[in-house]
Amino acid sequence: MFAVATAGVLAAATVPQLTTGVERARTSGAARYLAGRLAFARSQAVARSANVALAFAADGNTFTVAMYADGNGNGVRTADMSVGVDPLIEKAVRLSDLFPRVVLSLSDPSDTSPATSALMSFSPIGTASSRTLYLRGADGSQYAVRVLGATGRTRVLRYVASTRAWVEVL
């Protein structure tokens, strides 16, 4: 009886730590997933010798992300995407289906009017449109996925609250 009670107390003490670890891993996974999609879009742009973009669109309280290629040589544009001139090359995925309780912001979360859509484009020579995507987990962990336009390089950063600094993790 004593052993069962002790095991119950120990289990109750470790569950919150496990939950925090799961949420942090989920948020980190979401950041790495987006970094991977961005790197893949860049490689597709180079391979196709055409602009390729990831399109982010608000879908309720989450975002979808889809990949489009330039179909007429003028870059990937929302108007061309809607009429099929710029073809869909990877169907839209709801981020909340893959990473529940992870919140994506297309602009700095402190902005008073957050962005609800964005195109992150990559050119055939590997350059990109610069942007930072912000992710926040249910445990408060924060990650950023940053693309440097001149090189198309994608980096994943984690916010360390104790030092108030973003630290590169990938």
Where are these regions (language model features)?
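N-terminal helix-rich module
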Residues: 1-2, 9, 13-39, 43, ...
